[in-house]
UniProtKB/Swiss-Prot annotation:
Residues 42-65 are annotated as: Disordered. This is Large ribosomal subunit protein uL4. The gene is rplD. It comes from Vibrio cholerae serotype O1 (strain ATCC 39315 / El Tor Inaba N16961). One of its GO terms (biological process) is DNA-templated transcription termination. Belongs to the universal ribosomal protein uL4 family.
Length: 200
């Protein structure tokens, strides 16, 4: 199949990468797993046995008229432990390479179908100036966009750093979440070829 390249000849690409059916269940599973893996999972609270103190019985069992109590660190007491204390946990989910590649191909194919993937011969700015990048994006009628280049372009990265809803990444930096987070994805022809090789 062929992808239209703005201001250049069409680019021949693999149909298995850019023309496959959209597998919603697979994409959902991989995106959820990716987001889960980003969680810190470091929260921690103390149970009644971990809170310091509370060794002595606050008052005798009988004869005071008060409710019986065995420790001042009971969860129903102020400064007591937490009943079901949260503990650090690993939220990461296993995603096979085949599943990851399949999800990436599904997303890229859907971007092509929805005409949300724009391919250009090359994309750069001469100086790290946000104004220059805004002008370039205005020419292409883009404002909510992920820019994917073949290799890291520092000028482009610095120019986009202060723009809301604009992100610049090289091919190795893209993932399922970033591809679906933006309205449009702008890729250079070199990046398209690299993505194709990466997912082959």
């Amino acid at each position: 199949m062929e992808l239209m390249v703005k201001g250049a000849n069409a680019l021949t690409v693999s149909e298995t990468t850019f023309g496959r059916e959209f597998n919603e269940a697979l994409v959902h599973q991989v995106v959820v797993a990716y987001a889960a893996g980003a969680r810190q999972g470091t929260r921690a609270q103390k149970t009644r046995s971990e809170v310091s103190g509370g060794g002595a019985k606050p008052w005798r069992q009988k004869g005071t008229g008060r409710a019986r109590a065995g420790t001042i660190r009971s969860p129903i007491w102020r400064t007591g432990g937490v009943t079901f204390a949260a503990k650090p946990q690993d939220h990461s989910q296993k995603v096979n390479k085949k599943m990851y590649r399949g999800a990436m191909k599904s997303i890229l194919s859907e971007l092509v179908r929805q005409e949300r993937l724009i391919v250009v011969e090359n994309f750069s700015v001469e100086a790290p100036k946000t104004k220059a990048l805004v002008a370039k994006l205005k020419e292409l009628e883009l404002n909510d966009v992920l820019i994917v280049t073949g290799e890291v372009d520092e000028n482009l990265f610095l120019a986009a750093r202060n723009l809301y809803k604009v992100d610049v990444r090289d091919v190795t930096g893209i993932d399922p979440v970033s591809l679906i987070a933006f309205d449009k994805v702008l890729m250079t022809a070199a990046a398209v070829k690299q993505v194709e090789e990466m997912l082959a």
